[in-house]
UniProtKB/Swiss-Prot annotation:
Pfam families xrefs: Ribosomal_S13
Family: Belongs to the universal ribosomal protein uS13 family.
Biological source species: Vibrio parahaemolyticus serotype O3:K6 (strain RIMD 2210633)
Protein name: Small ribosomal subunit protein uS13
Function (record text): Located at the top of the head of the 30S subunit, it contacts several helices of the 16S rRNA. In the 70S ribosome it contacts the 23S rRNA (bridge B1a) and protein L5 of the 50S subunit (bridge B1b), connecting the 2 subunits; these bridges are implicated in subunit movement. Contacts the tRNAs in the A and P-sites.
NCBIfam families linked: uS13_bact
Length: 118
């Protein structure tokens, strides 16, 4: 298994799909990295040489991925909560942020129903 950005990349998948195992790299970004490095999308990771894997590592290193990206996202959410803005308050209360209705629905965000104690 090739190891890129601290993640074991699946060997038996095509390169374009295998790179999406890294948090922060989707299919479009994966295609862009492969085009930049000059590797075909339909080549399996097991067929790549060490030199090509090193080129992939360099291509992925140009982006914010994995732990750094997770940290950045959580810091952005924490900043919104500290500011006390509307989005921060909605995060704090675990409610939908983007104007969805909450009288009905929104169960995924709110969690299971809590019974009213009498």
């Amino acid at each position: 298994m090739a190891r890129i950005a601290g993640i074991n990349i699946p060997d038996q998948k095509h390169a374009v799909i295998a790179l999406t195992a890294i948090y922060g790299i989707g299919k479009t970004r994966s295609q862009a990295i492969l085009a930049e490095v000059g590797i075909a999308e339909d080549v399996k990771i097991s067929e790549l040489t060490e030199e090509q894997i090193d080129q992939l590592r360099d291509g992925v290193a140009k982006y914010t991925v994995e732990g750094d990206l997770r940290r950045e996202v959580s810091m952005n959410i924490k900043r919104l909560m500290d500011l006390g803005c509307y989005r921060g308050l909605r995060h704090r209360r675990s409610l939908p942020l983007r104007g969805q209705r909450t009288k009905t629905n929104a169960r995924t965000r709110k969690g299971p129903r809590k019974p009213i104690k009498k």
